[in-house]
Regions:
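Cationic, low-complexity basic patches in intrinsically disordered or flexible, solvent-exposed regions
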Residues: 4
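Generic alpha-helix initiation/capping and coil-helix boundary signal
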Residues: 7-10, 128
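Short, Lys/Arg-enriched N-terminal segments with co-localized hydrophobic residues
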Residues: 9-21
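Glycine-rich, acidic/polar active-site loops that bind/position phosphate-bearing ligands
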Residues: 20-269
Length: 269
């Protein structure tokens, strides 16, 4: 029987957790590219601070050998990786992570890659995906559990205006949200109807106080397209546009990939 370690889950059951898997073999990718007329392959990986990076190659140039042997890149130009004298690094694709980008004008297949040393093929110690893989392997080695499920409670703000500047003589930031309580006295086109969210009064109000229902619905649709299983979406407590969209927990590596997908979709929707 599989032993489970569940973290970050307050009201979810462990049953039914499975990763959205698009491909398991290289030939499946090649066939999909031809059948779906994919124009580009977006190669993605994560830097040490946790920011996803990418570059794009024409799908016509993708050979099956690349999906097995990987791609070379300059690791010295990526934060936290290597120095110039040891810049060569190799990216190895995780075919199970693939999804079609919902935002690109040209049909693009995204594949998430892990990083290895090009000379030894050993996992790169500062690749966040490799750190996650090592953590999962260590958990299994302890006998505490075979599988660890991670559930992220993903929350974010939607602002109408974000400004900041840092200069030698001047530093500031300014945020604004049309629905926020500090705009009750603001003159607005067509008149200010007063439907503003009070301080810490944003939890679960219906429209017109909640002005983001349609946006959350669109975000939820896009998240489903890229493979996440959605569970609920709502306005959060914060007056200035705080939102929450919950998606199903997953194993550590898959949960980390899901969070990268989540951030990409939310910021681009």
């Amino acid at each position: 029987m599989e032993k489970l370690l569940v973290l970050g889950l307050s009201f979810l059951e462990v049953t039914g957790a499975e990763r959205f898997v698009m491909f398991t073999q290289a030939q499946e990718v090649i066939d999909f590219i031809a059948q779906e007329e994919i124009a580009y392959i977006d190669v993605r990986f994560c830097d040490l601070p946790g920011v996803q990076q990418h570059f794009t190659i024409p799908a016509s140039e993708l050979e099956a050998s690349v999906l097995k042997d990987g791609l070379m890149f300059d690791g010295s130009s990526v934060r936290g990786f290597t120095q110039i004298h040891e810049s060569d690094m190799k990216l190895i694709p995780d075919l199970s992570s693939a999804f079609v980008d919902p935002f690109r004008a040209n049909k693009t297949l995204v594949i998430i890659f892990s990083i290895v040393d090009p000379f030894t093929d050993e996992p790169f110690s500062r690749d966040p995906r490799q750190v996650a893989a090592k953590a999962e392997a260590y958990l299994r080695s302890t006998g505490i559990a075979d599988t660890c499920y991670i559930g992220a409670e993903a929350e974010f703000f939607v602002f109408n205006d974000v400004r900041y500047q840092v200069s030698p003589q001047h530093t500031f930031y300014a945020l604004d949200s049309d629905e926020a309580y500090w705009n009750t006295g603001r003159s607005e086109a067509g008149g200010n109807l007063g439907y503003k969210v009070p301080v810490k009064g944003g939890y679960f109000p219906v429209s017109p106080a909640d002005d983001f229902t349609d946006l959350r619905d669109e975000m939820a649709n896009l998240l489903t397209e890229v493979g996440l299983t959605l569970e609920r979406a709502h306005h959060e407590v914060g007056s200035g546009g705080q939102q929450e969209i919950n998606y199903r927990f997953n194993t550590l590596m898959a949960a980390a990939d899901d969070m990268m997908k989540f951030k990409y979709v939310i910021k681009n929707a």
